[in-house]
Amino acid sequence: MVDGNYSVASNVMVPMRDGVRLAVDLYRPDADGPVPVLLVRNPYDKFDVFAWSTQSTNWLEFVRDGYAVVIQDTRGLFASEGEFVPHVDDEADAEDTLSWILEQAWCDGNVGMFGVSYLGVTQWQAAVSGVGGLKAIAPSMASADLYRAPWYGPGGALSVEALLGWSALIGTGLITSRSDARPEDAADFVQLAAILNDVAGAASVTPLAEQPLLGRLIPWVIDQVVDHPDNDESWQSISLFERLGGLATPALITAGWYDGFVGESLRTFVAVKDNADARLVVGPWSHSNLTGRNADRKFGIAATYPIQEATTMHKAFFDRHLRGETDALAGVPKVRLFVMGIDEWRDETDWPLPDTAYTPFYLGGSGAANTSTGGGTLSTSISGTESADTYLYDPADPVPSLGGTLLFHNGDNGPADQRPIHDRDDVLCYSTEVLTDPVEVTGTVSARLFVSSSAVDTDFTAKLVDVFPDGRAIALCDGIVRMRYRETLVNPTLIEAGEIYEVAIDMLATSNVFLPGHRIMVQVSSSNFPKYDRNSNTGGVIAREQLEEMCTAVNRIHRGPEHPSHIVLPIIKR
């Protein structure tokens, strides 16, 4: 029996296999016997529980309802011992922590996990460790392939904004974790705060690999991430994705259309859904905003994911899999999506949607597509004549990131108006005619472009945009391909200047109804900064080059019957 009261034990030290002790706080209900347990592994300070938990659940309700909650500082941070090296020790530490919990008299042998972002990644690491008592996980906005998200991406470009912003945040935690203050701590803290306040400025420093503060505080940032642009063995050794195929651990996966992890959240759902009770919730959210309210686009009160709703969903999921309450998820859909445009939630039976019609929309035009007032067109018919749109990509003047799946760029993520970049000559715009009927796009989006460049390496970007009758051009999803990685992320190969290549761009996913009076637009360019690092166009080691060593590229998008550049939209007709 549980009466709603609970006790707290702080800084209980849990031994790992190498003798390092990790600190946990125990929130235990006043119960007559052992209870199910929920574990959170947190690199952001377990004492600051309500700051990060507002993005997930009101977990104290779990405790009041009879669950014990264990919150742990990950290795090397705050009250835990050891050295913090991102991701490297987390699987073993999760396994050891779970084993310790299962040995405690107050645990009934059933453990679950929940949490957002890094806290979600630690759940996948725990799940693949194979500890039998882990009965369910609820990773929100997380990844099982850390190369593809958050540090690089499916196109091979460095997610420099995410890397520098997150590293600066972790750096502040490392400083405050120290038991003995150092003379340089105050100045270091101020510099880290400056990075967080101006990530674009920090990303503009060249060579990018010369980040003395981050390199000193978190050598992993340079040694593992920046200096390993290929998806090599060092990345594959910490990737979990290939191990998910046989995973039977039930998973409640939460994602956001404007979150940098959305592609990997959806990919992990597909990977585990056949062997486990996998549930998926996707809203119009970014990594730091679950309200559905943004400066350029408001989705209404229905888009807000209130803590209570998330808590209720999580509790039902854990009741089913930790307590064996078979009816706890009765009436709960396998997939729940927020469909933008009509701004409504919709229940689905699967992802991808079974009735998806993947439809090519071809780039065309009566003239040059440069700027939004150019002659670029978008239609389901291939243009009858061959043509090419040309622009200059200058790394010293990259196209600025406007909204989208940014993580730390001063909160400017989410559905942003793209009009501020429409007058740039290096932004090609291809638009449909004004729509007379609604067009629903729900699913993964990709582009197949025929491109050439004067450089031996460069980038190409593609962005899907909803153009409103009032002129707003709201971005929905986007992607990038680094030409050296056009064939494989493992073995880069440069291109021949002037030769035409067909490339695929993974633009992640969205769910949006383009309403009558709107237009569908595709924007193509060669940079999206600081979301991604700038390609130097030299074919060299980009992170080790000075800005003065970089060069301007003449880039072309070829279109027509011989080179049918197009975007593939997942059309839903109902």
From Swiss-Prot:
Temperature section of the record: Is relatively unstable at physiological temperatures since it displays a half-life of 13 minutes in rat plasma at 37 degrees Celsius.
Catalytic class of the enzyme: hydrolase
Documented effect of changing residue 169 to K: Displays greatly enhanced stability, with a half-life of 570 minutes at 37 degrees Celsius. Exhibits 4.5-fold reduction in catalytic efficiency
Binding residues annotated for substrate, in chain numbering: 44, 118
Pfam families membership: Peptidase_S15, PepX_C
Effect of residue 408 to A: Decrease in activity
Outcome when changing residue 259 to N: Loss of activity
Mutation effect (residue 407 to A): Decrease in activity
Cross-referenced SUPFAM superfamilies: alpha/beta-Hydrolases, Galactose-binding domain-like
Reported biotechnological use: Because of the high catalytic proficiency of CocE, it is an attractive candidate for novel protein-based therapies for cocaine overdose, as this cocaine-degrading enzyme could be used for rapid cocaine detoxification in an emergency setting. However, wild-type CocE is relatively unstable, but this can be improved by specific mutations. Thus, improved stability of engineered CocE enzymes will have a profound influence on the use of this protein to combat cocaine-induced toxicity and addiction in humans. Also has a potential as a highly-sensitive drug detector.
Result when mutating residue 151 to A: Decrease in activity
GO molecular function: carboxylic ester hydrolase activity; dipeptidyl-peptidase activity
Family per record: Belongs to the CocE/NonD hydrolase family.
Domain notes: It consists of three domains: domain 1 contains the active site; domains 2 and 3 are involved in substrate recognition. Domain 1 contains the GxSxxG motif found in most members of the alpha/beta hydrolase superfamily.
Protein name: Cocaine esterase
Protein source organism: Rhodococcus sp. (strain MB1 Bresler)
Upper lineage: Bacteria, Bacillati, Actinomycetota, Actinomycetes, Mycobacteriales
